[in-house]
Design a protein with these regions (language model features):
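N-terminal secretory signal peptides and thylakoid transit peptides that target proteins
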Residues: 1-20
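Active-site neighborhood of phospho(di)ester-bond hydrolases with catalytic His/Asp-centered motifs
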Residues: 164-166, 190-195, 224-230, 320-323, ...
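A short C-terminal boundary segment appended to hydrolase-like catalytic domains
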Residues: 404-432
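Short, flexible loop/turn segments at beta-strand junctions in immunoglobulin-like
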Residues: 111-116
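Extended active-site neighborhood of metal-dependent phosphoesterases/phosphodiesterases
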Residues: 57, 121-151, 204-314, 341-345, ...
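N-terminal active-site segment of His-dependent metallophosphoesterases
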Residues: 53, 60-68, 73-79, 84-102, ...
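C-terminal segment of N-terminal export signals and the immediately downstream linker at the start
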Residues: 26-67
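Short acidic, glycine-rich surface-loop motifs adjacent to enzyme active sites
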Residues: 197, 311-332
Length: 432
């Protein structure tokens, strides 16, 4: 993926082409003993080829904010230019502790201060950057993406829709078929419900399978919502996944560590994002003392109670929860996730904590994955919420879930990916 095969460079860069002849040198003018004798020193970054490795990935669109990430081929700095018209005019940078970003593999920026149900425009800007010493550094001229647009979510939209793909396990042909179907259905957002890859040992793996699996701007205008799966926690690079799949901002410091938990309204639908964690208990020898999910799930339970009390969530006509590992399995012998034998078929510890809140606040549907086979469980007298489980990574068992809701009903449909046949369709009436 180093040169992003199939990447339309001319369309992506717009009017700026970067190469040896067009590299601009930016030299610090800082004074002091450290830079004595090198005030005018500068050096071009060694890589003057294309240094953007993916189209922008729009994510985490809320009523008032959105984040954008993009992959790199060389160490760079960058920012997002945005505005209410294609003229843009504002800049967002992922600055931290007074420093603007400098990254090797991914850049990102969060746009804030937005208005609900409003259209915005943006483009990314990337400049390859080189440090030789503290004051001997340089950057190329920015490389710009095309201008894209998105609309913030909010409760005032008359309808809401989402598309779910899951357990892709770095199977790029399957990912491309999912995206092709999503292009036809035009959902408000794509929810990638865990196990995007089988493991994460380096950044290149993420660039190929997540940032640019289709060689197209598949997520530049239609946001990706990421719900972690158990495989998304495996490997030496798993802790860096947030560089590409950005986390949500929590408004309560108590929940700052819950980066992938969030609740938002998309028209009549309230979406609740939960993280079931790994498919074995923390004390399983497979983790070598590297798992600590029990307190993490307990904290999510406290967060979930607060999220479901939020007025815009509590008043939603439909409430849908998303998590990777199912919370229910009809098989009485199914592995519940709290024993040493093999791996969880469903996550009974999470169900014990979260199902009572689903009951109390009227959650109608849980959308899950993990089992690599489609299933649908109707509500029962002991469980008022339904559960749908998506398919697996191979075309033979892959399926897509699509949901559309308006003021009259919410309709859920599951489709086989290989022949586009319908596996089932269900409707839900408004809660309120």
């Amino acid at each position: 993926m180093g040169n992003c095969e199939g990447f339309n460079r001319r369309a992506f860069l717009g009017s700026v082409a970067v190469g040896v002849g067009s590299s601009a040198i930016l030299t610090s003018n800082a004074q002091g003993q450290e830079n004595k004798g090198q005030e005018n020193a500068s050096a071009k970054p060694e890589q003057t080829q294309q240094f953007v490795a993916s189209y922008p990935i729009l994510q985490n669109v809320t009523e008032t904010s959105a984040s954008i990430a993009w992959a790199l081929n060389t160490p760079s700095t960058g920012w997002v230019e945005w505005g209410t018209t294609p003229a843009l005019g504002k800049i967002a940078r992922n600055s931290e502790f007074g420093l603007n970003p400098f990254e090797e593999d991914f850049l990102s920026a969060r746009i804030s201060g937005l208005a609900p149900n409003t259209k915005y425009y943006y483009r990314t800007a990337t400049a390859a950057f080189s440090y030789r010493t503290a004051y001997d550094k340089s950057a190329t001229e920015p490389q710009y993406s095309d201008v894209y647009s998105f609309t913030t979510c909010g409760p005032n939209a008359k309808s809401g829709s989402f598309f779910v793909m899951n357990d892709t396990h770095n199977t790029i042909p399957t990912i491309r078929e999912h995206v092709k179907l999503a292009d036809e259905l035009k959902p408000d957002f794509i929810l990638w419900n865990g196990d995007l890859c089988s493991f994460y040992m380096d950044a290149q793996h993420i660039k190929e399978n997540i940032a640019n699996p289709t060689n197209s701007p598949y997520a530049a205008e239609r946001p990706i919502i990421f719900v972690p799966g158990n495989h998304d926690r495996r490997g030496s690079w798993a802790r860096n996944l947030k560089k590409c799949l950005t986390t949500w901002e929590q408004d309560d410091p108590k929940f700052y560590s819950l980066g992938y938990n969030y609740a938002f309204r998309q028209g009549p639908i309230a979406a609740i994002l939960l993280d079931t964690g790994e498919d074995k208990p923390d004390w399983h020898p497979a983790w070598s003392e590297m798992a600590n999910y029990e307190p993490y799930r307990e904290l999510q339970t406290a967060w979930l109670m607060k999220a479901l009390e939020r007025p815009e969530i509590k008043s939603a006509p439909y409430i849908v929860a998303f998590c990777h590992i199912p919370l229910y399995d009809k098989n009485p012998k199914a592995n519940p996730g709290n024993i040493l034998d093999r791996w969880a078929s469903f996550q009974w510890p999470c169900c014990q904590m979260w199902s009572p809140l689903f009951e109390k606040y009227g959650v109608q549907l849980a959308v899950a994955a993990h089992q690599h086979r489609f299933s649908y469980a109707e509500p029962t007298k002991d469980r008022s919420w339904a559960q749908i489980v998506g398919g697996g990574p191979e075309m033979a068992n892959a399926c897509s879930i699509y949901c559309y809701a308006d003021e009259n009903e919410m309709k859920l449909t599951c489709t086989k990916l290989d022949d586009k046949s319908e596996l089932g369709s269900w409707t839900y009436k408004p809660r309120v």
